[in-house]
Amino acid sequence: MNNYDSEHKSNIDFKIMAFFFKIRDFFKDPMKKIEKVDLQKGDYILEYGCGPGSYTIPIAEKIGPTGKVFAADIHPLASEKVKKRADKNDLSNIDTITTDCKVDLEKSSIDKVVLIDVLHGLENYESHLKEFYRVLKKDGRLWVDDHHFDEQQIKSRILSTDLFRYVGKVDSLYEFQKVSL
């Protein structure tokens, strides 16, 4: 497959995924999940693997105009889709990042990292967890939800790096806290 074909397939795959997420979101309001994450007005959030922004918009609404969401995804169409949704919802507290790991944010600048249905797809999850650790503030939180993994798989991946400690679970969301090294 040449470069054009693989990029075209990737774009089609993203559009199909976005379509199915739109249907999912109609039946399962993303805000209901986000309400369970301990988000505060003014928080700085990294949503890694944001896709078309299903959870980005509710996060931005919950943290308000004094907060900031950094919506990161590997696919360039994710950035376009999130920007359009932010404009449609009159939200100016969302920045997008296209990346496969490094997010180019300052060290200790993020209150919480949110990973929803992403952990299973991270080929080198240790590198990602190190990057999340780097950008999280002291005692920052990592929230993970991934229906592809059971509880043991989620915990073992996150805890294997010794960068986070397990805090607890709220419904399908697992909370971890950055540890001091």
Identify the meaning behind each predicted range.
Residues R24-D43:
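Conserved alpha-helix/loop element of class I SAM-dependent methyltransferases that forms part
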Residues A60, E126-R141:
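A short glycine-rich, Lys/Arg-flanked "PGG" loop and its adjoining helix->strand segment in the class I
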Residues H75:
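Conserved SAM/SAH-binding beta-strand->alpha-helix loop
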Residues D90-C101:
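Conserved SAM-binding strand-loop segment of SAM-dependent methyltransferases
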Residues K102-V113:
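A short acidic, Gly/Pro-enriched loop at the edge of an enzyme's catalytic core
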Residues D111-Y125:
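A short SAM/SAH-binding and catalytic strip from SAM-dependent methyltransferases
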Residues D162-L181:
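Core SAM-dependent methyltransferase catalytic element
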